[in-house]
Swiss-Prot record, chain B:
InterPro entries: ATP_synth_F0_csu, ATP_synth_F0_csu_sf, ATPase_proteolipid_c-like_dom, F/V-ATP_Csub_sf. Its main location: membrane. GO terms for cellular component: plasma membrane; proton-transporting ATP synthase complex; proton-transporting two-sector ATPase complex, proton-transporting domain. F(1)F(0) ATP synthase produces ATP from ADP in the presence of a proton or sodium gradient. F-type ATPases consist of two structural domains, F(1) containing the extramembraneous catalytic core and F(0) containing the membrane proton channel, linked together by a central stalk and a peripheral stalk. During catalysis, ATP synthesis in the catalytic domain of F(1) is coupled via a rotary mechanism of the central stalk subunits to proton translocation. Key component of the F(0) channel; it plays a direct role in translocation across the membrane. A homomeric c-ring of between 10-14 subunits forms the central stalk rotor element with the F(1) delta and epsilon subunits. Keywords: ATP synthesis, Cell inner membrane, Cell membrane, CF(0), Hydrogen ion transport, Ion transport, Lipid-binding, Membrane, Transmembrane, Transmembrane helix, Transport. This is ATP synthase subunit c. It is found in: Cell inner membrane. GO terms for molecular function: lipid binding; proton-transporting ATP synthase activity, rotational mechanism. The gene is atpE. It comes from Jannaschia sp. (strain CCS1). Belongs to the ATPase C chain family.
């Protein structure tokens, strides 16, 4: 390399290859690196490591606390759900009871009404039967009388008893 | 500028050596492009490989820097 | 040299990386306080502000600055745990130191007019070399000669194994190189491009708004790259550590 001969402060060639400055650069570089190394390893790195560890610890603790709170929240939710279900069941029960009561009342009323209806029906039936009876009697009377008259008109002497028996036989037959 | 053949040779040589920088650029582009192609196919694996990417780029680039250095030496140091 | 630029455009994209003494302009000895020293000091201050002052509240519910510090802690912690497993957590302070230093040095370097310590190969080589030595020593201490099984791919056919062993060995020793150049190269390239665009803006007069838009876009990209490079450096450290703890394929 030709630079070894040039040297000096003249801007000839690459300053990087100015070998006369190498010992100087190396000397100061080593000092600077040692300084940085000691600053880092004695002060900065233990401090940062401690801070990071502390933060890690805090985060872990916070996470645990959060987990606990979450569990609590889940428990509370469960209790709430249970209460809700209970209330719902109770409401159902009340509804069912009310329904049963109403049903029972309704049944009683219906029965009463049925009985009344049945009594009325029986009464009417009796009345109808009486009417029918009397109607049948009247028909018998009319038939007897008619039969007597007919016999008389035809010239016979009607025996009341025979006529009645004949009419009765006819009415039955 | 009168007929200094040696100086002309220096300059021509420096210019030729500078071509090497372009070649290194091709190399670096190749590395990065292939990395991107692979990363798009499998994005989940890409994050773990960026260190490899940079090492590859560094190796490709170092040789280009050597060419640049030769150019500098020819220009300034010979 | 490109510095003898033509056509009126004077761009010195590499000037921002020059190491110079803070006081006077004598020779740079190994103990001379330089702009590297200043910005490394700022990185230490930034780490202190973020991780010590920001977390002083020790609150369970973190303040804004405390949660940023905790996020960074948790991010790297998870990364180490995912990649290396439980055994790797012993080395978490070491990896966290690397991550925070790279991330904050990258971001500090994005302040206009600042000096970016991570753009220097000397710096990143120390970081990557330290990782390499640590991982190799750790591998042999933990596994003894069994660590060499890392290179003996037992799943490959027997004929191929010696060839694979050579390839694995080479790739093992290339690790610190790519590990360091990747970080320095990314940061350096971004800053140099910003400077080139700034040079355009200075020379275009009325039309300078076009490169200024470009600067805004590239600046945004650089913010992203700063974070990604810190992440990549850290995760590769984790991967190498995993190889040392569990060398069997």
């Amino acid at each position: 390399m030709a630079t070894e001969t040039t040297g000096g402060t003249e801007a000839a060639g690459m300053p990087q290859l100015e070998f006369s400055t190498f010992p100087n650069q190396i000397f100061w570089l080593v000092i600077a690196l040692l300084a940085i190394y000691f600053i880092l390893s004695r002060i900065a790195m233990p401090r940062i490591a401690a801070v990071l560890a502390e933060r890690q610890g805090t985060i872990t603790n916070d996470l645990a606390a959060a987990e606990e709170l979450k569990l609590k929240a889940v428990e509370a939710e469960e209790a709430y759900e249970k209460a809700l279900a209970d209330a719902r069941a109770e409401a159902h029960q009340i509804v069912a009871e009310a329904k049963a009561e109403i049903q029972a009342e309704l049944d009683v009323e219906i029965q009463k009404a049925d009985a009344e209806i049945a009594a009325k029906t029986a009464e009417s039936e009796k009345a109808i039967a009486a009417i029918r009876e009397s109607a049948a009697e009247s028909v018998k009377e009319v038939a007897k009388d008619t039969a007597k008259e007919l016999v008389a008109v035809l010239g016979g002497k009607a025996d009341a008893r025979t006529v009645t028996a004949a009419v009765n036989a006819r009415m039955k037959g | 500028m009168e007929g200094d053949i040696a100086q002309m040779g220096q300059f021509i040589g420096a210019g030729l050596a500078a071509i090497g920088s372009g070649a290194a650029a091709i190399g670096v582009g190749h590395v990065a492009g292939n990395f991107l192609a692979g990363a798009l196919r499998n994005p989940s694996a890409a994050a773990g490989q960026t260190a490899t990417l940079f090492i590859g780029i560094a190796f490709a680039e170092a040789l280009g820097i050597f060419a640049f250095l030769v150019a500098l030496l020819l220009m300034f140091a010979v | 040299m490109a510095d003898e630029a033509k056509g009126g455009i004077e761009i010195h994209p590499m000037d921002q990386f020059i190491v110079e003494p803070l006081f006077g302009d004598g020779a740079i000895h190994w103990y001379t306080p330089t702009n590297v020293t200043l910005w490394l000091f700022f990185a230490v201050v930034a780490v202190t502000l973020l991780m010590v002052v920001g977390t002083r509240g020790r609150a369970i519910v973190p303040s804004r600055s405390q949660s940023v510090g905790e996020m960074a802690y948790g991010f790297v912690y998870k990364m180490v745990e995912d990649v290396t497993g439980k055994e790797g957590l012993k080395y978490f302070p070491y990896i966290f130191t690397l991550f925070l230093y790279i991330l904050l040095a990258n971001f500090l370097g994005l302040i206009p007019g600042s000096f970016t310590t991570t753009s220097h190969i000397a710096v990143t080589a120390v970081l990557a070399g330290a990782v390499f030595v640590t991982v190799t020593v750790l591998g042999f201490v933990k596994n003894g000669a069994g660590f060499l099984s890392l290179f003996w791919v037992s799943s490959a056919p027997l004929v191929l194994r010696p060839i694979l062993a050579i390839i694995e060995l080479i790739s093992y020793f290339v690790r610190p190189v790519s590990h360091s150049i990747r970080l320095a190269g990314n940061v350096m390239a971004g800053h140099a491009v910003l400077k080139v665009f700034a040079g355009f803006a200075a020379s275009l007069g009325v039309f300078s708004f076009i490169p200024i838009f470009g600067i805004v876009a590239i600046y945004a990209l650089e913010v992203l790259v700063s974070a990604i490079q810190a992440y990549v450096f850290t995760i590769l450290t984790c991967v190498y550590l995993k190889d040392a703890l569990h060398p069997h394929h």
